[in-house]
């Protein structure tokens, strides 16, 4: 996993382009100290970053394959397709996205079908567990429950059907909001900006926030909004959620911290995530300076080749790629 992360950081340096020093926020992330070796999230991040690099280099089939492989480890790399779909719809260039989607489906099936055929019960255990389990300790639902005594949407035993539906609907509404924003914005949003919003909505609304999930947010946030103090503060607060939760679970008899203290840390973490998302929205709407665009003559370094960064990209005129590819011109009315 350590070697995989080193390679991931090297690819992030490629994607950071002319802001290569922002890569230090990824390499030295406080979240990495606590969660790097928890579960299989590092490989999924590796495949997601590799997919973004492949898409930047116009290798859309490869990008799709990598997204499918990443999704075989963890669900979140599939969220990248939402970002690329938004850009594809805005540009009316669906062919690159279609290749990515097809390759992602095929590669995911290539990994999962043999496992399913060998042991279908084991293959479906993840879905069963996530369907049947209730909310996790550090979600907004758990915080509301501890503060108000609320017992949840569902009553009795069995799968939390209403909770599952509510979390899914809230996430889908968030994705729809990202799509509308991406289509209506004055200039095509950058891929990292869209990914930040999609992943952010998933983290905030999902009924499970395993501590290592926060690692998913690190690289998109660094590439979308390289505000060092804000990101380092968020990562430091987020890093504290897990040890504070463990401390709380020790119980009052063993000097564990009270529930209100855990709630404060969780609310602070969520507030930072939401603040980052709000700033990204303001950036997309042109109400905040975009340091990444400024450093690349208006281009999105995740959608354009380094050779293209030398020439300014006019806000009111399309670029002229030599082949069909995602670019960053405004939407055509």
PLM-predicted stretches and their roles:
Residues 233-333:
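Aromatic-enriched
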Residues 134, 140-204, 288-333:
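Aromatic/glycine/proline-enriched transmembrane-helix motif characteristic
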Residues 115-145:
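Extracytoplasmic catalytic-loop and juxtamembrane helix elements of membrane-embedded
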Residues 3, 24-28, 32-50, 73, ...:
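Multi-pass, polyprenyl lipid-linked donor-dependent membrane glycosyltransferases
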Residues 1-19, 24, 48, 173-181:
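Transmembrane-helix motifs of polytopic, lipid-linked glycan transferases
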Residues 40-42, 65-87, 110, 204-213:
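Transmembrane helices and adjacent periplasmic/lumenal helix-loop junctions
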Residues 44-60, 199:
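Specific aromatic-rich, kink-prone transmembrane helix
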Residues 79-106, 117:
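Perimembrane helix-loop-helix junctions
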């Amino acid at each position: 996993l350590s070697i995989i992360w080193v390679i991931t950081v090297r690819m992030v340096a490629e994607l950071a382009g002319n802001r290569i020093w922002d890569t230090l926020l990824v390499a030295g992330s406080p979240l990495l100290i606590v969660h790097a070796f928890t579960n299989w999230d590092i490989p999924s991040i590796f495949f997601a970053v590799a997919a973004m690099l492949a898409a930047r280099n116009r290798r859309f089939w490869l990008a799709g394959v990598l997204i499918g492989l990443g999704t075989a480890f963890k669900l979140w790399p599939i969220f990248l397709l939402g970002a690329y779909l938004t850009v594809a719809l805005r540009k009316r260039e669906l062919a690159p996205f279609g290749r990515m989607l097809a390759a992602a489906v095929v590669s995911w099936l290539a990994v999962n079908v043999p496992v399913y055929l060998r042991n279908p019960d084991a293959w479906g255990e993840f879905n069963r567990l996530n369907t049947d389990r209730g909310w996790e300790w550090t979600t907004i639902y758990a915080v509301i429950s501890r503060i108000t005594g609320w017992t949840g949407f569902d009553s009795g035993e069995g799968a939390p059907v209403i909770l599952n539906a509510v979390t899914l609907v809230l996430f889908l509404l968030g994705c729809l909001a990202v799509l509308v924003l991406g289509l209506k914005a004055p200039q095509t949003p950058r891929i990292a900006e869209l990914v930040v919003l999609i992943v952010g909505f998933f983290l905030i609304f999902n009924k499970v926030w395993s501590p290592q999930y926060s690692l998913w947010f690190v690289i998109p946030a660094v590439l979308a909004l390289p505000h060092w103090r804000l990101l380092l503060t968020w990562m430091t607060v987020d890093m504290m959620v897990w040890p504070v939760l463990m401390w709380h679970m020790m119980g009052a008899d063993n000097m564990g911290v009270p529930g209100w203290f855990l709630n404060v840390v969780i609310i602070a973490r969520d507030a930072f995530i939401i603040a980052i998302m709000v700033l990204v929205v303001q950036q997309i709407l042109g109400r905040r300076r975009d340091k990444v665009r400024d450093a690349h003559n208006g281009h999105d370094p995740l959608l354009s080749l380094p050779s293209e960064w030398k020439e300014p990209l006019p806000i009111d005129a399309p670029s002229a790629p030599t082949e069909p590819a995602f670019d960053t011109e405004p939407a055509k009315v």
